[in-house]
């Protein structure tokens, strides 16, 4: 009988994970701040998925320094296969013979990262908030784990993990801390930190951070971890809602399985929003707004504990199964805590992000499809709000199609069926069709649905009927401001009393995108009457400063320059520098030169491009 080899369904890995599956990884690493490297070993437990037909294991690697390889304790032959961009250099480990179906072997690889590692960021003390110690953190999604250690770097394989990490500074990892296991510091001032991840996770959720980190409780099963000088304000920001959010989603899906839900607030130079690493969400400090209004990021990352981390897209071509579901669940949490109109308000903001992304790529672009073709591509290149918002709109459409109460019964069924597994869009489709097969009304509606258009048509999907009650009031307020000075409108502090920070954000966005511009006097008046310049909420303050810069209002120059020295998230930094440069180029360049060492290298390079163009021009 001929051997049937199923080709792997993930095109972005070079591993032969169709022959072998890693079931457990022990990661032993020493964090070398002076060299900006990790050094140590990884031990994989591999299960054979063939009847002894494979006598070698191929793993993903990228810019790694491999020392030696042992199989079941014995030195093994290994070689690098030819490098293939953008996926790296496959590591081929030779076995003496094939292994029977479901039998295990142990592979121990000594490894050191290199300066070309794409997953690790090393911050100088100057880039942290109290500027005392260096800091490092990882970001493995989508295909960067392979630059830390050899692995099957695909979301289609999940394994349990043990972390044994040695560092001179406290360590966070994507496992439960083995409490009380930290040894006394060794003579070299380093401490061993241990973590265990009992729930199988894909490689992209492998996470490490180390720096001057302290913890404080924010709920019965949650802590926030951050720099000691920021601990109090982070605790206040998160302690009111974290457990409320967990309770809300547990009612929608089923109980939280990871033990603890913790949040690591990264240094202010962190250039991104957040990452759903299990047990410890990694988050931007810009969510700490002193008004508890920006923590929808936490609702999103928490929702990943079910969608993405427990039930996972089998490849990045089906990324909407992670992010569309997570955005859907995030908005269900918001509705449960704040009311249904807030879900629609969030979806309206999301629809704007979706139209922006479609405009960016072009309405016919492959990356605007729900299911993308990533053969030969780097999944990072396809990253946008499309899988989040087109995915959300698809699920919202399905909810409206079958009815909310019926869809609510499907949610826990789906998350139970694929718990601990990975799936693709076709399995999702067959699962929902099967679930409703005995309900003639829902079944007919689902079978008549144009699945192919939802899955494969580029561009925008049909726009749903959203409840616009929460945006109408701010659209109206923006119109009144834009009617000045030719109208009788007299702005009062009461205009925005009772509005959420996100409503104020939408109001300011309307002013920014309008053809009509405010005068410098009106911009200043807006800031004074509404207290916008003094807002601790960066989402609000940065947009108000953009409005002021666009209007030519000199009163925002000082606070803009001040903010640019405190936050490194590109979402805020890049537009502020662009607008500052248009108004006062000298001030923009001076501000950038003053703070350049504070910014993350990615952010620094992008702002340099924005301010000075390409270096060779």
UniProtKB/Swiss-Prot annotation:
Cofactor(s) needed: Zn(2+)
EC class name: hydrolase
Binding site for a peptide: 139-141, 271-276
One GO MF term: metallopeptidase activity
An annotated GO BP: lipid metabolic process
Gene3D superfamilies attached to this UniProt entry: 3.30.2010.30, Neutral Protease Domain 2 (1.10.390.10), Peptidase M1, leukotriene A4 hydrolase/aminopeptidase C-terminal domain (1.25.40.320), tricorn interacting facor f3 domain (2.60.40.1730)
Keyword list, A-Z: Cytoplasm, Hydrolase, Metal-binding, Metalloprotease, Nucleus, Protease, Zinc
Binding note for cofactor: Binds 1 zinc ion per subunit.
Gene Ontology cellular component list: cytosol; fungal-type vacuole lumen; multivesicular body; nucleus; NVT complex
Chain positions recorded as Zn(2+) binding sites: 300, 304, 323
SMART domains in the record: Leuk-A4-hydro_C (SM01263)
Record keyword Cytoplasm present: yes
The keyword Nucleus is assigned to this record: yes
Catalytic activity, as annotated: an epoxide + H2O = an ethanediol
Record-linked InterPro entries: Aminopeptidase_N-like_N (IPR045357), Aminopeptidase_N-like_N_sf (IPR042097), ARM-type_fold (IPR016024), LTA4H (IPR012777), LTA4H_cat (IPR049980), M1_LTA-4_hydro/amino_C_sf (IPR038502), M1_LTA4H (IPR034015), Peptidase_M1 (IPR001930)
Family as reported in the entry's similarity comment: Belongs to the peptidase M1 family.
PANTHER family given in the database record: LEUKOTRIENE A-4 HYDROLASE
Protein name, per record: Leucine aminopeptidase 2
Organism of provenance: Neosartorya fischeri (strain ATCC 1020 / DSM 3700 / CBS 544.65 / FGSC A1164 / JCM 1740 / NRRL 181 / WB 181)
